[in-house]
A protein has these predicted regions:
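C-terminal motif of bacterial Sec signal peptides marking the signal peptidase cleavage site
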Residues: 14-17
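An edge-strand/N-cap motif at the start of beta-rich repeat modules
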Residues: 27-93
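Residue position within the beta-strands of beta-propeller blades
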Residues: 62-64, 72-73, 127-130, 177-179, ...
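Residue-level signature of beta-propeller blades and closely related beta-rich strand-turn architectures
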Residues: 67-68, 132-134, 182, 237-239, ...
């Protein structure tokens, strides 16, 4: 099962598919950026107009950071730049319109000098969450690239020790909204930062989080959906033995900053096929109602998974409704354990199905399979396109986005050798696998085509 980790760890993995490691050139927060991050003493208002949920996808464009070696397959990392990918054509160009810019310094709006950069598109504007780390400190910083792609502004620098919950970011016509986990993982605070002046306002602090112990902690509230001036959040509550699990929903009203507890979605006790004993036997349980927070794609919300009947649905927690996505998926049964993962896009849904072979004691047999299905209008189509990843055997292609009838995916792999430097300055070489990205018509993908148009990078 895919588990959502705290963003401090997830940034280095595949949370939004737009993080990218860059050279370790950690800057020090300046007095100006620290002052910009200071909270307002007396917040007068909390934004205006309708909220918009942000992801890397926006209006037919997908924003992602690429190093030079991912583009040219060279043996040195080179620059790291933020690119805007046109999903219709496959054209990818730096998010910079400065005349004559060589895109080779921090003067370029598209320059990525953080260790990790996550991108959030809002029309032509781009918000950046940068994570800086070295041996001495680590911290996050919010920045914004203007709609004309000529200016880049620091909005807020986060104090070391706090973690940004990177899945679930929203804006309105005044503010950017995000939340922070304290270092002790017991408190989470929802903040608003003025996108024009960098002034911060604290909206609400949750004090009901677990203490960060156990496999499924730290607990955190994830932003699921926005509507008007309301933000809907949910946190997963789960015991360390993983037998009890629920999603607790709440709503934050930005007209007055109030919070309202909402419904609680609890997983059923399930059909126990094998009762674990903590030693030789492992639990094998088929659940009828299991819930997951969507952590990938361009839609937020909850997935409802029925491992007994093979059904997957989408829960709109804001209005407490369930919409079927598709059915007929493999089920958890004697000898097999199944898990489903749901991602939402503008053009449909992607369901991952992981099947794990289990023996009579519930332990793994090593017979594992992973399939992915694209679903729209209640009809599912298995995506059989695959790629060979050296060292990892054959893998499914990786879908990043599906909007306006087009799909952006990592559809192949390139292998090479790169140079790196140890902390003591010693140069060494190591093998490297690069994803090859391309676009394709959704209808062609569903028909089984592998005729992707590779991304065309330009300066």
């Amino acid at each position: 099962m895919k588990k959502y980790l705290a963003i401090a760890a997830a940034l280095a993995l595949t949370l939004t598919a737009c993080g990218q490691a860059a050279a370790d050139s950690t800057p020090t927060p300046t007095a100006a950026t620290e002052a910009a991050a200071a909270p307002a003493e007396q917040p007068q208002s909390i934004g205006s107009d309708a909220l918009r949920l942000l992801t890397a996808a926006a209006d037919g464009v997908y924003y992602q950071v690429f190093n030079d070696w991912e583009i040219n397959y060279t043996d040195t990392m080179g620059r790291a730049l933020i690119y805007a990918i046109d999903e219709q054509t496959g054209d990818a160009r730096p998010v910079c319109n400065l005349p004559g810019c060589a895109h080779d310094s921090a003067a370029c709006p598209a320059w990525s000098d953080g260790n990790v950069t996550l991108c959030y598109g809002d029309g032509d504007e781009v918000y950046l969450l940068l994570f800086y780390y070295n041996d001495e400190t680590s911290y996050y910083r919010w920045e914004r690239i203007s709609a004309d792609h000529t200016q880049r502004t620091v909005l807020a620098t986060i104090e070391p020790g706090q973690s940004v919950v990177g899945r679930g970011v929203a804006v309105d016509d005044v503010n950017l909204y995000y939340s922070l986990l304290d270092e002790d993982n017991r408190h989470q605070t929802l903040w608003a930062v003025d996108t024009a002046g960098g002034q911060m306002q604290r909206i609400y602090t949750w004090d009901d989080l677990a203490d960060g112990t156990g496999e499924y902690c730290p607990e955190m509230y994830m932003l699921l959906e926005v509507s008007g001036r309301q933000m809907t959040f949910a946190k997963m509550v789960q015991t360390n033995d993983a037998l009890t699990k629920a999603m607790q929903v709440c709503a934050v009203n930005l007209t007055d900053g109030s919070i309202t507890p909402r419904q609680r979605y609890e997983r059923d006790t399930g059909n126990v096929l094998v009762q674990g004993d903590g030693m030789e036997k492992r639990n094998l349980i088929s659940y009828r109602n299991d819930y997951h927070i969507l952590t990938e794609g361009s839609r937020g919300g909850l997935a409802n998974c029925n491992y007994q009947s093979g059904e997957v649905g989408f829960v709109d927690a804001a209005v407490d409704t369930l919409t079927p996505v598709a059915d007929g998926f493999p089920t958890t049964r004697d000898g097999w354990e199944c898990y489903y993962s749901l991602s939402g896009f503008a053009d449909g849904w992607l369901v991952w199905v992981d099947e794990y072979g289990r023996d009579e004691d519930g332990n793994g047999t090593g017979e594992n399979t992973t399939r992915q299905y694209f679903c729209r209008d209640g009809v599912k189509t298995e995506l059989t396109q695959q790629r060979y990843v050296p060292g990892k055997d054959v893998r499914n292609i990786r879908i990043l986005d599906a909007q306006q009838g087009r799909v952006l995916a990592a559809y192949d792999t390139k292998t090479g050798t790169v140079h790196d430097v140890d902390k003591d300055g010693t140069t060494y070489t190591q093998p490297m696998n690069w994803d090859i990205y391309g676009v394709i018509a959704l209808d062609d993908l569903l028909a089984g085509s592998t005729d992707f148009t590779p991304l065309a990078f330009s300066d």
